[in-house]
Amino acid sequence: MQIAVLRTGLGVRGNALRAGAVLIALLAAFAPMLASAQVAPAQLDPAQGAPSQALRKVTVVSFGLFGGQDVFRSEATGAAAVVASRFGGDPVVVRFNTRKSRDATIDSLAATLDAVPKRMDPGTDILFLILTSHGSPEGLAVTAGRRSATLTPARLAGMLDRTGVRHKVVIISACYSGVFIPRLASADTLVITAADRNHSSFGCEDKAKWTYFGDAFFNSALRQSETLREAFSIARSLVLTWELRNGFEPSHPQIAGGENVEPLLVARH
């Protein structure tokens, strides 16, 4: 912008008047810019005050709850490793049962989750909980040595509520695991299950390293995806392909909730 100054023969007073006019013109010209600069702070993204993803701590807890088959030990261990490599994990807690040991019980899961808030910021950090087992419409089978029990949706919801951790991702690989969604899923809790509440999931052979869903989601899709939802979409298609090829009724994997969690998680390259 250019401001023209007219020269006249008005002398000193004329010069003063002319200088005043120039000053007024300058103030008028830059007033909009000054006003916008003053309101800029009010337009800042509210998220600027939140910790960046790099500063958020991710805790991974993974339990293989059925001791009668080695596939659940293998899947609990492998799933935790993949999640930690993609999103970070500090700490990573893995427990599983075998035909003789009883490391992954309902009580030990409760104790592990109770200890989580001591090692993270419950308001900003993120908890991944991975559970793999056989399932029923009532919940997850917990078989430790000769002892058997059922982890119900209500019991698990109570454990998670007691942690006070806001941002959670719960991934359950089991038949009928969709039964957990109504009690667990919310804007702050993303829930991913291997099946809906009415169907079985497949692939739990004793010598296998993964179930169908575990292989598709953790071992395949999550290794190459930027987000959990993208990984889920890929895994769901893979699982359906394998089920139809083998003549199984589709398990219908589910994803629900997590609107406040997903933006905080982008996989590492």
Regions found by a protein language model. Give the residues of each.
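Boundary/activation segment at the start of structured domains
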Residues: 2-4, 11, 30, 35-124, ...
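Bacterial N-terminal signal peptides that target proteins for export
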Residues: 4-23
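Bacterial N-terminal signal peptides
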Residues: 20-32
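Structural recognition of the beta-strand scaffold that forms the well-ordered cores
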Residues: 59-62, 92-96, 127-131, 168-172, ...
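Solvent-exposed loop/turn segments at secondary-structure junctions
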Residues: 66-70, 98-102, 133-138, 147, ...
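Extracytoplasmic/secreted proteins, especially bacterial periplasmic and envelope-associated proteins
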Residues: 74-78, 82, 104, 108-115, ...
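A short, glycine/acidic-enriched catalytic loop
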Residues: 133-163
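Active-site-proximal C-terminal subdomain of hydrolase catalytic domains
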Residues: 174-262
